[in-house]
Design a protein with these regions (language model features):
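Minor-groove-contacting beta-hairpin "wing" of winged helix-turn-helix DNA-binding domains
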Residues: 70-76
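Extreme N-terminal segment that seeds HTH/winged-HTH DNA-binding domains in transcriptional regulators
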Residues: 1-48, 53-56, 60-65, 76-78
Length: 78
């Protein structure tokens, strides 16, 4: 799915950008555990599925890593 010029970004991309900014600005430093996806959805006032898609984007960018049973963490800086 592509975006048209002049249209606002898709919601999951906006959420991914917001979380990425928090990581880049040091609010979530490398190695820190992120809130759960459900908690993030509540804090950002978006649907749970939106946060799940945003996390996929951040994982693909290498910004976060998920350890099953432990949670999602900010990846070490490269």
């Amino acid at each position: 799915m592509t975006e048209s010029p002049g249209r606002p970004p898709l919601e999951y991309r906006r959420v991914a950008g917001a979380i990425e900014a928090l990581i880049e600005n040091g609010y979530f430093p490398p190695g820190s555990k992120l809130p759960s996806e459900k908690e993030l959805a509540g804090q950002l006032d978006v649907a749970y599925g939106t946060v799940r898609r945003a996390m996929v984007v951040l994982r693909e960018r290498g910004l976060i890593l998920t350890i099953w049973g432990k949670g999602t963490f900010v990846a070490p800086r490269q």
